[in-house]
Amino acid sequence: MHPTETHQLSIEFTNSSGPQVLEFKEDLKNWLIGSGEEAFVEGALDNLFEDPSYEITADEQFADLGGGLQSIFVYKYDLEHLERLRAELEKNFAHQIKCDITSLTTESWMEGWKESFKPITSARFYLYPPWIQDEKPANRIPIVIEPGMAFGTGQHATTVLCLEAIEQFFDKTTSLDRFLDVGTGTGILAIAAKKLGYNYVLGTDIDSDAIIASKENIVQNNCKMDLVQGSIPVDQAPFDLVVANIIFFVLKQIIGDLSAQVKPGALLILSGLLAEETREMEEYALKAGLRLEKEETRDDWAAQVYRKI
C-alpha cells in the first residue's frame, strides 16, 4: 500500500523576469536531476489536475518564454527527504528562490490525475490502471500499473518507445535469461520482461518512492523479480538485455557503466532522450563500446537500441 500522506515541496522563483532567469531555471532543474530528482511538476497544482501532460522532466523547455516563471513542485512520500532537499536548495540558491513544504493525503493527490491515465495497447501488451475495469483484449498480455509517485505509466512517449523496442527484440531472440531495467520507476518495463518469459529480472531505481510503486505493481501482476534501490548493480553483470529509460543528462554520465552490464553481442535500449540529443548520445555510446542498431522517435522523444561490440 502507498503511504497515506504525500508531501509537496514548492520552489518559487523570487525574480521572474529577464532571459537570465530562464537560464537560472534550467540550471536549477539540472541541479535537481543531479540530486536524483528525475521527475517533477512545473506549474500550479490546479493546472496539474486539468492538464494530462503534467509529467515534465528536466530536459523539457519552459513553454512560455515571454511570461513569468512557473513554480516547480516535487512530490514525495518521505517528508525528511523533502526537508533535506529544501535545505540544500536554500543553501545553493539563496535569494533566488523561496521554498515551502505542504502535505496532503495520497488519496487526494492520486485522484487528481486519474482521468489522464488511459489504457495503452501495444503489439503484445495491454497496460491499464487498477480503477479501469473494462474488458481486456484477449490477444494482449495485461499489465496493471498504479504509478503512485514514480515515473513510467505508459503515458509518456519514452516508456512506449522502450516497450516497443523490448517487444521487437523479443521477436528476434531466443535468449531470455537475464534482463536489467535501470531507473525502473513503476516497474512497467521490468514487469513486461518477466511476462515475456525472462528467467531473471532486476529493476533498480535511486528513488525510494519508485521502489514502493514498483513493489506494489509486481505484486499486482503476480511477478517474481528483484528490486534494488540504487543505480547500476554491482556484481550482477552480464545481462542479455539492458534498458535505461532515464534522461540524457544522466545517461551520458553512466553510459560506460551501462555498457559494462551488457553481454558481448547483446543489446542496450536507451530512452528518455530528446530527438535533438540522439547524435551526442551516440558519440558517448560509441566510446563505451556500443554500436547504434536502431532509433525511433515520437513526440520529439527518442529511443535508441545499441549492440555491445
Features from the language model and the residues they span:
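Nucleotide donor/acceptor-binding cores
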Residues: 70, 176-178, 266
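SAM-dependent Rossmann-like transferase core, predominantly class I methyltransferases
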Residues: 106-173
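A structural signal for isolated positions on well-ordered beta-strands in alpha/beta enzyme cores
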Residues: 73, 100, 202, 226, ...
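S-adenosylmethionine
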Residues: 206-309
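Conserved SAM/SAH cofactor-binding pocket of Class I
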Residues: 149, 153-235
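A structural alpha-helix within SAM-dependent methyltransferase catalytic domains
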Residues: 29, 163, 191-194, 255, ...
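N-terminal auxiliary segments of SAM/dcSAM-dependent transferases
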Residues: 4-6, 11-136
